[in-house]
């Protein structure tokens, strides 16, 4: 299976979660073992030159790709979560969304100097969530090696925003 073959497993759901939004549903891709394996293999191949020490991902769908990619790369996994979900001491970052603000947290001992972290999520839209995740990793003294996504929303400026950080930005498909 090739990267373009994955498109058939991404379902568009119009007007979800709100009117005018097209939600990209990846559950058909997750259900198909060949498509799922191909996605993980292609992501691993794309980032193989980065020499990362861990993969960090934002809940919830980022965990799917982050966890499997960390396993495939043979490195650790770092969860980045919404407030109140992590049991140990945390560092947090407030960031802007299209219509408001949100907060992400990471355990304060999740990474540190000398670590090279790959940030993974399912969709790259504005880049706000990924940049907040990168800011958290940097706050811990670790380096962000790059970013990896399944989908890039071509009508949004997230790729340009993250590219300005001077890190590699990988994605498999533009929708």
From Swiss-Prot:
Its EC number is 2.4.2.7. Keywords: Cytoplasm, Glycosyltransferase, Purine salvage, Transferase. It catalyses: AMP + diphosphate = 5-phospho-alpha-D-ribose 1-diphosphate + adenine. Gene3D superfamilies: 3.40.50.2020. The keyword Cell division does not apply. Pfam families: Pribosyltran. GO terms for cellular component: cytoplasm. The keyword Glycosyltransferase applies. Pathway: Purine metabolism; AMP biosynthesis via salvage pathway; AMP from adenine: step 1/1. GO terms for molecular function: adenine binding; adenine phosphoribosyltransferase activity; AMP binding. Signal peptide: none annotated. InterPro entries: Ade_phspho_trans (IPR005764), PRibTrfase_dom (IPR000836), PRTase-like (IPR029057), UPRTase/APRTase (IPR050054). Its main location: cytoplasm. GO terms for biological process: adenine salvage; AMP salvage; purine ribonucleoside salvage. It is found in: Cytoplasm. Catalyzes a salvage reaction resulting in the formation of AMP, that is energically less costly than de novo synthesis. Belongs to the purine/pyrimidine phosphoribosyltransferase family. Homodimer. This is Adenine phosphoribosyltransferase. It comes from Coprothermobacter proteolyticus (strain ATCC 35245 / DSM 5265 / OCM 4 / BT).
């Amino acid at each position: 299976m090739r990267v373009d073959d994955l498109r058939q497993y991404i379902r568009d759901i119009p007007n979800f979660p709100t009117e005018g939004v097209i939600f990209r549903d990846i559950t058909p891709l997750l259900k198909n073992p060949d498509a799922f394996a191909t996605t993980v293999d292609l992501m691993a191949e794309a980032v193989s030159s980065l020499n990362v020490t861990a993969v960090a991902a934002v809940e919830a769908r980022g965990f799917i790709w982050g966890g499997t990619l960390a396993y495939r790369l043979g490195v650790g996994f770092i969860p980045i979560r919404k407030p109140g979900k992590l049991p140990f001491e945390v560092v947090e970052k407030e960031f802007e969304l299209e219509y408001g603000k949100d907060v992400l947290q990471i355990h304060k001992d999740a990474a540190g100097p000398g670590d090279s972290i790959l940030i993974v999520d399912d969709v790259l839209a504005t880049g706000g969530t990924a940049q907040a995740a990168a800011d958290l990793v940097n706050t811990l003294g670790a380096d962000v090696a790059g970013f990896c996504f399944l989908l890039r929303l071509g009508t949004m400026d997230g790729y340009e925003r993250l590219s300005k950080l001077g890190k590699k930005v990988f994605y498999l498909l533009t929708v």
